Amino acid sequence: MAAAVDTFLFTSESVNEGHPDKLCDQISDAVLDACLAQDPESKVACETCTKTNLVMVFGEITTKANVDYEKIVRQTCRDIGFVSADVGLDADNCKVLVYIEQQSPDIAQGVHGHLTRRPEEIGAGDQGHMFGYATDETPELMPLSHVLATKLGARLTEVRKNGTCPWLRPDGKTQVTVEYYNENGAMVPIRVHTVLISTQHDETVTNDEIAADLKEHVIKPVIPEKYLDEKTIFHLNPSGRFVIGGPHGDAGLTGRKIIIDTYGGWGAHGGGAFSGKDPTKVDRSGAYIARQAAKSIVAAGLARRCIVQISYAIGVPEPLSVFVDTYGTGKIPDKEILKIVKETFDFRPGMIAINLDLLKGGSRYLKTAAYGHFGRDDADFTWETVKPLKWEKPQA
C-alpha cells in the first residue's frame, strides 16, 4: 500500500468469559438453554447481576420446564473457572438469589395470543430496531479489528484452561487498533497499530513473564504476521497489577457488552441486548436475521460492505421498516438490493424462529454469550448460513 494513501485508525475491544458482565450474559443464556431444552415455547427474559460472593438471577419466565436455577448458576460459574474466592468468585460457596416471575399476561396475549397463534401470526415481543452488518475484509465477513480482539480473548481463556499459562485467572480484556484504508466505501485493513491486553493473574508471576507469555502464546497464534510490524505498539497489562478480578473486582450485569457481542463498534446497534432472551424477543432474533441478510448480500458479491436495519412494533408480526445501505460498494442500486432482501428473507418473528431453528436449547445460546454472536464457524450459529440471492450482474 503506497505511503501517500490516506488511512485511519479504528479500535475494537473484547472481554473474555471471566469478565463479570460476560459471566452474567452466560448465566442468563444457560437459563434460557435449560428452559428451551424442556419446553421450546418457553418465554424467557432472564437477567443476572453479580458482585463479591453473590449472584442474582431475576426476570420473567413462563415455561413448562422444571429448572434448577441455582444449580445452573453454580455450574456456569464453575465451568468458567470461578472455583475460589481468590480468583474472584467461589461457585460452590457464593450466595445465589433467584427472583423469577411469570411473563406479563398483557405481553403474552399481544405477542402470541397465549399460544393460540400460528407461527406467521406471532407478533414481535417488543418494539425496537436492529442492525446486521457484513464486510469483505475477513473470511468471516466481519470487521478485522473486532475479529482480532475477540480471538485474543478466546485464546486467553484457552491457554488458561489448557495449562499453557497457569498464572492466568478468568477475567480479562483485549483491544485492537487497526489501520485501515477506505477503498470507495469498502474497508481494507493494512496493519495492526496497537494491541492491548489486560488479564487477571495470580500473585506469583512477574510483569515481564506476563508480557513474554502473552506475546508468545496469545498474540502470535492469533494475529497474522502480515499485520504486525516494528511499529506495532503493545500494551500488556499496562496497569501493572490485576490480581483481583471477576465479580470481586467489578459488579457484573447482563447486557452490558452489546458492542462486543456484535461488530466491535462498526455498523450500528439498536441498543437491545441478546442474552437471556427467547426468540420472540426481536432484540435477539431480529439482529440474527439482519446479520444473515447483510452477510448474504456481501457473500453474493452484491456489495463489499453492507448494513441492514429492521424495526418492529410490539404484537405486530411484519417489520415496520427494512433498510439496506452498501456504503457505495453495491454492484446494483441499494433499492434493488432491498427488494431482493425482502423477497428472500421472512422477517416475521415466528418465522425467524423456525427458519433459523431458534427454539432449540442445550448449550446453544450459552455458546453465543462469550466471544461474539457473529462470524462464528459453528452449526448452531444458523444465522451465519449464507442464503443464495438471485441477481443479475449489470452489463459492463
Curated annotation (Swiss-Prot):
Residue sites binding K(+) per the record: 47
Location relative to the cell: Cytoplasm
Induction: By salt stress, in stems and leaves (at protein level). Follow a circadian regulation with higher levels in the light.
GO cellular component terms attached to this protein's record: cytoplasm
Cofactor(s) the record lists: Mn(2+); Mg(2+); Co(2+); K(+)
Any single biological process term in GO: S-adenosylmethionine biosynthetic process
Catalytic activity annotation: L-methionine + ATP + H2O = S-adenosyl-L-methionine + phosphate + diphosphate
InterPro entries for the chain: ADOMET_SYNTHASE_CS, S-AdoMet_synt_C, S-AdoMet_synt_central, S-AdoMet_synt_N, S-AdoMet_synthetase, S-AdoMet_synthetase_sfam
UniProt keyword annotations, A-Z: ATP-binding, Cobalt, Cytoplasm, Magnesium, Metal-binding, Nucleotide-binding, One-carbon metabolism, Potassium, Transferase
Enzyme class: transferase
Pfam families named in the record: S-AdoMet_synt_C (PF02773), S-AdoMet_synt_M (PF02772), S-AdoMet_synt_N (PF00438)
Co-factor: note: Binds 2 divalent ions per subunit. The metal ions interact primarily with the substrate. Can utilize magnesium, manganese or cobalt (in vitro). Binds 1 potassium ion per subunit. The potassium ion interacts primarily with the substrate.
Positions bound to Mg(2+): 13
Residue intervals passing through the bilayer: none
Single Gene Ontology MF annotation: ATP binding
Enzyme Commission number(s) from the entry: 2.5.1.6
Subunit text: Homotetramer.
Record-linked HAMAP family: S_AdoMet_synth1
Entry function: Catalyzes the formation of S-adenosylmethionine from methionine and ATP. The reaction comprises two steps that are both catalyzed by the same enzyme: formation of S-adenosylmethionine (AdoMet) and triphosphate, and subsequent hydrolysis of the triphosphate. May be involved in the synthesis of betain in response to abiotic stress such as high salinity.
Family: Belongs to the AdoMet synthase family.
Entry-linked PANTHER family: S-ADENOSYLMETHIONINE SYNTHETASE
Entries under NCBIfam families matching the protein: metK (TIGR01034)
Protein name, per record: S-adenosylmethionine synthase 4
